């Protein structure tokens, strides 16, 4: 029997039940010193520690920044590389649900989170990076949720990102002609919407990772279908599920069919939770392929072949079709990268939704070296940063 338990957390919590360097990120040593409103972190890369002696130290400064969206504070972490001169900037946009700026989630165990690893790796390369907690994520989520009931929307997510850009461009030594975004999963949709709306401070280039290429509701349905693969009454269950979704999308009252598994019913109930509206209904019909075709700036799409939340063939093909004839859209499908760009050694056929999500941020997990290399090289080409 396939368990639908993980679907209590649903697509809204990271497209299935949620959320660079290479293997040497596994055992970094951190020395932390606090000063006033900022923190300085010194990362000691184990690849340069030999015989107990540190031969090289890469240092950079991280500080907390905040901005306001509809009267609610958004908290971010700005990380600057050592040295002066004008620097390109990168804003990170997390995936769905309570995924925070580090791409950690209270729904998933572990703190080895890809957003933080990517930000540190790219800061080492010379970029100023900014990652932030959505208002419905991070340590302030409890106090924010009551204020967000009935107000959660696609535009609200874009406004959070716009605030991040405003904060980034006000940073000393940022190069306004070299602004980038690195988004994951649902965050890629918000990045595309921002790019199509922004009159100022448009991104020089967009890195879209784990990007859905089909309507979000269809991607979520495929995930359910995969979990139900071994059920003898799968087809009947999916018809009942589809009827509920049809009512939901149409804005009609939706009562989960009592014959559906508990996890499916929990997913359907979560869609109509007041705290998730109108956002959930907007998200369910969103088609990223319609957006990517409208963006003029260079785009890099990275979908790992070990990603079981979006399908590199189905979603990648949909995005490639939408971008046909556009010369500045690049696609990369790393062989061993999962949804959050971690290295996954197992065959894709061995991976199940129930256990993959809980391993995303597990201790010892590292970013996929090839995925990171693709991102670093593409950003270097677009920004002029020497590797």
Where are these regions (language model features)?
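N-terminal cap/lid segment of alpha/beta-hydrolase-fold proteins
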Residues: 45-85
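Short, surface-exposed "cap/lid" segments of acyl-processing enzymes
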Residues: 83-121
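Accessory cap/linker subdomain of secreted extracellular hydrolases
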Residues: 139, 201, 207-291
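Alpha/beta-hydrolase active-site loop
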Residues: 149-171
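Primarily recognizes the serine-hydrolase "nucleophile elbow" in alpha/beta-hydrolase
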Residues: 167-173, 177-227
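Short beta-strand/loop motif that positions the catalytic acidic residue
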Residues: 295, 301-303
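Short alpha-helix in the alpha/beta-hydrolase fold that links the catalytic acid
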Residues: 297, 308-322
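Catalytic active-site module of serine/aspartate enzymes centered on a nucleophile-bearing elbow/loop
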Residues: 337-341, 346-387
């Amino acid at each position: 029997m396939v368990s639908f338990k993980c679907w209590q957390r649903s697509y809204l919590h990271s497209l299935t039940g949620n959320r660079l360097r290479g293997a040497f990120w596994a055992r970094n040593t951190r020395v932390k010193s606090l000063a006033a409103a900022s923190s300085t972190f010194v990362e000691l890369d184990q690849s340069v520690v030999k015989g107990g002696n540190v031969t090289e130290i890469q240092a950079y400064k991280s500080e907390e920044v905040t901005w306001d969206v509809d009267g609610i504070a958004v908290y971010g972490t700005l990380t600057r590389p050592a040295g002066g001169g004008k620097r390109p900037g990168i804003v990170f946009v997390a995936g769905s649900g309570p995924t925070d700026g580090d791409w950690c989630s209270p729904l998933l165990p572990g703190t080895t989170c890809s957003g933080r690893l990517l930000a540190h790796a790219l800061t080492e390369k010379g970029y100023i990076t900014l990652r932030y907690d959505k208002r419905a994520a991070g340590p302030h989520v409890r106090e924010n949720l009551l204020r967000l009931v009935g107000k959660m929307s696609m535009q609200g997510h874009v406004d959070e990102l716009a605030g991040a850009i405003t904060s980034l461009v006000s940073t000393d030594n940022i190069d306004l002609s070299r602004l980038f975004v690195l988004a994951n999963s649902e965050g890629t949709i918000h990045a595309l919407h921002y790019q199509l709306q922004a009159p100022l401070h448009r991104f020089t280039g967009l890195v879209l990772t784990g990007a859905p290429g089909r309507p979000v509701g269809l991607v979520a349905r495929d995930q359910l279908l995969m979990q139900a693969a071994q059920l003898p009454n799968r087809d009947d269950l999916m018809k009942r599920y589809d009827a509920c979704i049809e009512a939901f999308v149409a804005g009609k009252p939706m009562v989960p069919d009592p014959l559906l598994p508990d996890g499916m019913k929990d997913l359907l109930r979560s869609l109509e939770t007041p705290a998730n509206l109108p956002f959930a209904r907007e998200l369910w019909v969103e088609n990223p392929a319609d957006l990517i075709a409208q963006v003029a700036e260079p785009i890099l799409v990275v979908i790992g072949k070990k990603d079981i939340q979006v399908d590199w063939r189905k979603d990648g093909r949909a995005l490639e079709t939408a971008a046909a004839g556009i010369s500045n859209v690049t696609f990369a499908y790393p062989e061993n990268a999962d949804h959050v760009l971690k290295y996954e050694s197992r065959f894709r056929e061995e991976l199940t939704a129930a256990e993959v999500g809980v391993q995303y941020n597990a201790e010892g997990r590292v970013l996929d070296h090839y995925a990171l290399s693709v991102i670093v090289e593409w950003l270097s080409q677009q920004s002029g940063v020497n590797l």
